[in-house]
Amino acid sequence: MTISSNIATDFTDKQAVKVITGLNNFKIQQIKQMTQASEIAGATYLDIAADINIIEEIRSTSTIPICVSAITAEELVHCQQAGVQILEIGNYDAFYEQGRLFSSREIMEISQNTRERLPETTLCVTIPHILCIEEQIKLTQDLQNIGVDIIQTEGKSTSFSKQGDLSGIIQKSASTCSSTYAISKNSNIPIISASGISALTSPISFLYGASCIGISTNIKRLNNVASMVMYIYEIKTAIEYNRGVKKDINHSIRKSIINCQLGYYDLRMESHV
Protein backbone atom coordinates (compact mmCIF):
# COMPACT_ATOMS: atom_id res chain seq x y z
CA MET A 1 0.00 0.00 0.00
CA THR A 2 1.28 3.46 -0.88
CA ILE A 3 -0.20 6.86 -0.07
CA SER A 4 0.80 9.54 -2.55
CA SER A 5 3.80 11.47 -1.21
CA ASN A 6 2.09 14.85 -1.62
CA ILE A 7 -0.54 13.98 1.02
CA ALA A 8 1.33 11.36 3.09
CA THR A 9 2.78 13.73 5.72
CA ASP A 10 -0.61 15.13 6.77
CA PHE A 11 -2.02 11.60 6.99
CA THR A 12 0.92 10.41 9.10
CA ASP A 13 0.52 13.43 11.39
CA LYS A 14 -3.25 12.82 11.57
CA GLN A 15 -4.15 16.34 10.48
CA ALA A 16 -5.17 15.93 6.83
CA VAL A 17 -8.07 18.00 5.47
CA LYS A 18 -9.83 17.03 2.24
CA VAL A 19 -12.20 19.46 0.52
CA ILE A 20 -14.92 17.60 -1.41
CA THR A 21 -16.59 19.35 -4.34
CA GLY A 22 -18.94 16.40 -5.01
CA LEU A 23 -19.09 13.37 -7.26
CA ASN A 24 -21.99 14.87 -9.25
CA ASN A 25 -20.95 18.52 -9.00
CA PHE A 26 -19.98 19.86 -12.43
CA LYS A 27 -20.40 23.58 -11.59
CA ILE A 28 -16.98 24.69 -12.75
CA GLN A 29 -17.18 28.16 -11.18
CA GLN A 30 -17.97 26.78 -7.73
CA ILE A 31 -15.30 24.09 -8.10
CA LYS A 32 -12.70 26.72 -9.05
CA GLN A 33 -13.68 28.81 -6.01
CA MET A 34 -13.32 25.79 -3.72
CA THR A 35 -9.99 24.93 -5.34
CA GLN A 36 -8.63 28.44 -4.83
CA ALA A 37 -9.84 28.53 -1.23
CA SER A 38 -8.34 25.09 -0.53
CA GLU A 39 -4.96 26.15 -1.89
CA ILE A 40 -4.90 29.45 0.00
CA ALA A 41 -5.99 27.88 3.30
CA GLY A 42 -3.62 24.93 2.98
CA ALA A 43 -6.04 22.02 2.67
CA THR A 44 -4.27 18.71 2.06
CA TYR A 45 -6.08 17.86 -1.17
CA LEU A 46 -9.21 18.31 -3.27
CA ASP A 47 -11.79 15.64 -4.16
CA ILE A 48 -13.62 16.31 -7.45
CA ALA A 49 -15.90 14.58 -9.95
CA ALA A 50 -14.38 12.13 -12.42
CA ASP A 51 -14.63 14.54 -15.33
CA ILE A 52 -11.64 15.02 -17.64
CA ASN A 53 -12.52 18.64 -18.50
CA ILE A 54 -12.72 19.58 -14.82
CA ILE A 55 -9.48 17.73 -14.07
CA GLU A 56 -7.65 19.58 -16.84
CA GLU A 57 -9.08 22.94 -15.77
CA ILE A 58 -8.06 22.48 -12.12
CA ARG A 59 -4.61 21.13 -12.96
CA SER A 60 -3.96 24.09 -15.25
CA THR A 61 -4.68 26.67 -12.54
CA SER A 62 -3.70 24.97 -9.27
CA THR A 63 -1.01 22.80 -7.72
CA ILE A 64 -3.18 21.29 -4.98
CA PRO A 65 -3.24 17.46 -5.08
CA ILE A 66 -6.39 16.14 -6.77
CA CYS A 67 -8.50 13.09 -5.97
CA VAL A 68 -11.39 11.95 -8.14
CA SER A 69 -14.43 9.99 -6.97
CA ALA A 70 -16.39 7.48 -9.05
CA ILE A 71 -18.09 4.11 -8.72
CA THR A 72 -16.59 2.28 -11.70
CA ALA A 73 -13.05 1.12 -12.38
CA GLU A 74 -13.31 2.40 -15.95
CA GLU A 75 -13.91 6.00 -14.87
CA LEU A 76 -11.06 5.86 -12.38
CA VAL A 77 -8.61 4.39 -14.90
CA HIS A 78 -9.54 7.12 -17.38
CA CYS A 79 -8.83 9.80 -14.76
CA GLN A 80 -5.54 8.20 -13.75
CA GLN A 81 -4.46 8.35 -17.37
CA ALA A 82 -5.26 12.08 -17.25
CA GLY A 83 -2.72 12.52 -14.46
CA VAL A 84 -4.72 12.00 -11.26
CA GLN A 85 -2.78 10.02 -8.63
CA ILE A 86 -5.41 9.71 -5.87
CA LEU A 87 -8.57 7.76 -6.69
CA GLU A 88 -11.67 7.10 -4.61
CA ILE A 89 -14.56 4.69 -4.87
CA GLY A 90 -17.27 6.54 -3.03
CA ASN A 91 -19.26 9.70 -2.33
CA TYR A 92 -22.52 7.76 -2.58
CA ASP A 93 -24.95 10.47 -1.42
CA ALA A 94 -26.18 11.29 -4.92
CA PHE A 95 -26.98 7.61 -5.45
CA TYR A 96 -28.73 7.18 -2.10
CA GLU A 97 -31.09 9.97 -3.12
CA GLN A 98 -32.02 7.86 -6.17
CA GLY A 99 -32.60 4.78 -4.01
CA ARG A 100 -29.33 3.19 -5.19
CA LEU A 101 -27.55 1.23 -2.43
CA PHE A 102 -24.18 -0.54 -2.41
CA SER A 103 -23.46 -3.95 -0.90
CA SER A 104 -20.14 -5.19 0.50
CA ARG A 105 -19.85 -7.58 -2.42
CA GLU A 106 -20.29 -4.83 -5.01
CA ILE A 107 -17.78 -2.57 -3.27
CA MET A 108 -15.25 -5.41 -3.18
CA GLU A 109 -15.73 -6.18 -6.88
CA ILE A 110 -15.22 -2.53 -7.92
CA SER A 111 -12.23 -2.18 -5.60
CA GLN A 112 -10.54 -5.38 -6.74
CA ASN A 113 -11.04 -4.50 -10.40
CA THR A 114 -9.59 -1.03 -9.84
CA ARG A 115 -6.63 -2.26 -7.79
CA GLU A 116 -5.73 -4.94 -10.34
CA ARG A 117 -5.72 -2.37 -13.13
CA LEU A 118 -3.94 0.34 -11.13
CA PRO A 119 -1.67 -1.41 -8.60
CA GLU A 120 0.52 1.64 -7.84
CA THR A 121 -2.09 4.39 -7.56
CA THR A 122 -3.35 5.61 -4.17
CA LEU A 123 -6.82 4.09 -3.73
CA CYS A 124 -9.43 5.14 -1.18
CA VAL A 125 -12.77 3.36 -0.66
CA THR A 126 -15.81 4.71 1.17
CA ILE A 127 -17.55 2.25 3.48
CA PRO A 128 -21.36 2.58 3.05
CA HIS A 129 -23.04 3.73 6.25
CA ILE A 130 -26.02 1.46 5.48
CA LEU A 131 -23.90 -1.54 6.52
CA CYS A 132 -23.96 -2.57 10.16
CA ILE A 133 -20.77 -2.00 12.16
CA GLU A 134 -19.83 -5.67 11.93
CA GLU A 135 -20.09 -5.58 8.12
CA GLN A 136 -18.14 -2.31 7.93
CA ILE A 137 -15.25 -3.82 9.89
CA LYS A 138 -15.23 -6.98 7.78
CA LEU A 139 -15.34 -4.99 4.52
CA THR A 140 -12.48 -2.78 5.71
CA GLN A 141 -10.33 -5.80 6.52
CA ASP A 142 -11.09 -7.38 3.14
CA LEU A 143 -10.25 -4.13 1.34
CA GLN A 144 -6.99 -3.80 3.24
CA ASN A 145 -6.09 -7.35 2.21
CA ILE A 146 -6.36 -6.46 -1.50
CA GLY A 147 -4.19 -3.37 -1.11
CA VAL A 148 -6.61 -0.48 -0.60
CA ASP A 149 -4.67 2.43 0.94
CA ILE A 150 -7.32 4.54 2.70
CA ILE A 151 -10.85 4.01 4.04
CA GLN A 152 -13.49 6.74 4.25
CA THR A 153 -16.41 6.54 6.66
CA GLU A 154 -19.71 8.33 6.13
CA GLY A 155 -22.73 9.28 8.20
CA LYS A 156 -26.41 9.07 7.42
CA SER A 157 -26.98 10.70 4.05
CA THR A 158 -29.32 13.59 3.44
CA SER A 159 -31.85 11.19 1.97
CA PHE A 160 -32.10 9.48 5.35
CA SER A 161 -31.92 12.63 7.47
CA LYS A 162 -33.35 15.88 6.13
CA GLN A 163 -32.62 17.90 9.26
CA GLY A 164 -30.53 20.98 8.51
CA ASP A 165 -30.24 22.09 12.13
CA LEU A 166 -27.56 21.31 14.70
CA SER A 167 -29.31 18.05 15.60
CA GLY A 168 -29.03 16.81 12.02
CA ILE A 169 -25.35 17.77 11.78
CA ILE A 170 -24.51 16.03 15.05
CA GLN A 171 -26.45 12.94 13.96
CA LYS A 172 -24.38 12.66 10.77
CA SER A 173 -21.06 13.30 12.49
CA ALA A 174 -21.89 10.85 15.29
CA SER A 175 -22.55 8.17 12.70
CA THR A 176 -19.27 8.67 10.85
CA CYS A 177 -17.27 9.02 14.08
CA SER A 178 -18.75 5.77 15.42
CA SER A 179 -17.71 3.96 12.25
CA THR A 180 -14.27 5.57 12.40
CA TYR A 181 -13.79 4.41 15.99
CA ALA A 182 -14.93 0.85 15.30
CA ILE A 183 -12.78 0.47 12.19
CA SER A 184 -9.71 2.06 13.82
CA LYS A 185 -9.92 -0.50 16.64
CA ASN A 186 -9.96 -3.40 14.18
CA SER A 187 -7.49 -2.32 11.47
CA ASN A 188 -4.47 -0.09 10.97
CA ILE A 189 -5.55 1.46 7.69
CA PRO A 190 -5.73 5.30 7.54
CA ILE A 191 -9.31 6.57 7.88
CA ILE A 192 -11.11 9.66 6.60
CA SER A 193 -14.21 10.87 8.48
CA ALA A 194 -16.45 12.70 6.05
CA SER A 195 -20.02 13.48 7.11
CA GLY A 196 -21.28 16.35 9.22
CA ILE A 197 -17.72 17.55 9.79
CA SER A 198 -17.36 21.09 11.15
CA ALA A 199 -15.06 23.05 13.46
CA LEU A 200 -17.06 21.51 16.30
CA THR A 201 -16.85 17.89 15.19
CA SER A 202 -13.50 17.71 13.35
CA PRO A 203 -11.36 17.33 16.51
CA ILE A 204 -13.64 14.49 17.66
CA SER A 205 -12.97 12.60 14.43
CA PHE A 206 -9.24 12.60 15.13
CA LEU A 207 -9.77 11.55 18.75
CA TYR A 208 -11.77 8.60 17.41
CA GLY A 209 -8.97 7.44 15.12
CA ALA A 210 -9.21 9.42 11.88
CA SER A 211 -6.13 10.49 9.92
CA CYS A 212 -8.11 12.92 7.77
CA ILE A 213 -11.46 14.71 7.69
CA GLY A 214 -13.50 15.56 4.60
CA ILE A 215 -15.58 18.73 4.33
CA SER A 216 -18.15 19.43 1.64
CA THR A 217 -21.71 20.61 2.32
CA ASN A 218 -20.85 23.41 4.73
CA ILE A 219 -18.23 24.93 2.45
CA LYS A 220 -20.46 24.66 -0.65
CA ARG A 221 -23.05 26.82 1.12
CA LEU A 222 -20.60 29.74 1.04
CA ASN A 223 -20.64 31.95 -2.03
CA ASN A 224 -17.18 33.50 -2.19
CA VAL A 225 -13.56 32.45 -1.89
CA ALA A 226 -12.84 34.60 1.18
CA SER A 227 -15.61 32.93 3.20
CA MET A 228 -14.44 29.49 2.10
CA VAL A 229 -10.86 30.29 3.12
CA MET A 230 -12.00 31.43 6.55
CA TYR A 231 -14.07 28.29 7.00
CA ILE A 232 -11.13 26.00 6.16
CA TYR A 233 -8.90 28.03 8.49
CA GLU A 234 -11.50 27.60 11.24
CA ILE A 235 -11.45 23.82 10.73
CA LYS A 236 -7.64 23.67 10.73
CA THR A 237 -7.41 25.87 13.83
CA ALA A 238 -9.82 23.62 15.71
CA ILE A 239 -7.77 20.56 14.73
CA GLU A 240 -4.45 22.17 15.70
CA TYR A 241 -5.80 23.49 19.01
CA ASN A 242 -6.97 20.03 20.03
CA ARG A 243 -3.85 18.17 18.85
CA GLY A 244 -2.11 18.90 22.15
CA VAL A 245 -5.08 17.78 24.22
CA LYS A 246 -4.51 14.21 25.33
CA LYS A 247 -7.81 12.64 26.25
CA ASP A 248 -8.78 9.10 27.12
CA ILE A 249 -12.11 8.67 25.36
CA ASN A 250 -12.56 5.06 26.43
CA HIS A 251 -14.39 5.96 29.64
CA SER A 252 -17.03 7.91 27.72
CA ILE A 253 -17.87 5.11 25.31
CA ARG A 254 -17.29 2.04 27.47
CA LYS A 255 -21.02 1.44 27.83
CA SER A 256 -22.10 2.86 24.50
CA ILE A 257 -23.99 0.94 21.82
CA ILE A 258 -21.01 1.01 19.49
CA ASN A 259 -18.76 -0.53 22.15
CA CYS A 260 -21.32 -3.27 22.85
CA GLN A 261 -21.43 -4.06 19.14
CA LEU A 262 -17.64 -4.24 19.02
CA GLY A 263 -17.62 -6.62 21.98
CA TYR A 264 -20.20 -8.81 20.29
CA TYR A 265 -18.15 -8.74 17.08
CA ASP A 266 -14.99 -9.82 18.97
CA LEU A 267 -16.86 -12.73 20.56
CA ARG A 268 -18.22 -13.79 17.17
CA MET A 269 -14.74 -13.74 15.67
CA GLU A 270 -13.28 -15.75 18.56
CA SER A 271 -15.97 -18.40 18.18
CA HIS A 272 -14.88 -18.97 14.57
CA VAL A 273 -11.20 -19.40 15.40
Swiss-Prot record:
Subcellular location: Plastid, Chloroplast
Chief location bin: plastid
InterPro entries to which the protein is assigned, alphabetical: Uncharacterised_Ycf23
SUPFAM superfamilies on file: Aldolase
One GO CC annotation: chloroplast
Top-level taxon: Eukaryota
Protein name: Uncharacterized protein ycf23
PANTHER family, sorted: PTHR36895, YCF23 PROTEIN
Entry keyword Chloroplast: yes
Native source organism of the sequence: Pyropia yezoensis (Susabi-nori)
Pfam families in the cross-refs: DUF561 (PF04481)
Keywords for this protein: Chloroplast, Plastid
Family classification: Belongs to the ycf23 family.
